[in-house]
From Swiss-Prot:
Phylogenetic placement of the source organism: Eukaryota, Viridiplantae, Streptophyta, Embryophyta, Tracheophyta
Family: Belongs to the metallothionein superfamily. Type 15 family.
Pfam families on file: Metallothio_2
InterPro entries recorded: Metalthion_15p
Protein known as: Metallothionein-like protein BIF98
Function noted in UniProt: Metallothioneins have a high content of cysteine residues that bind various heavy metals.
GO molecular function, one term: metal ion binding
PANTHER family given in the database record: METALLOTHIONEIN-LIKE PROTEIN 2A (PTHR33543:SF36)
Keywords: Metal-binding, Metal-thiolate cluster
Organism superkingdom: Eukaryota
Amino acid sequence: MSCCGGNCGCGSGCKCGNGCGGCKMYPDLGFSGESTTTETFVFGVAPAMKNQYEASGEGVAENDRCKCGSDCKCDPCTCK
């Protein structure tokens, strides 16, 4: 498995998208021995959720079933 390990995102046409920056993609998520605490509050109103039968006829994103494999190539690519 490459060091992208889940940081790859498949873009349009089942090509690997802009989500793969390599091992140092998220430097602040590394372990440096320091500990910090961050609190985030999100306030807002979300639209009502549709049940699965109402939402099933709507468009599906082109990269819905793609995921990036070990070498940042899409694996498997089953986009419809």
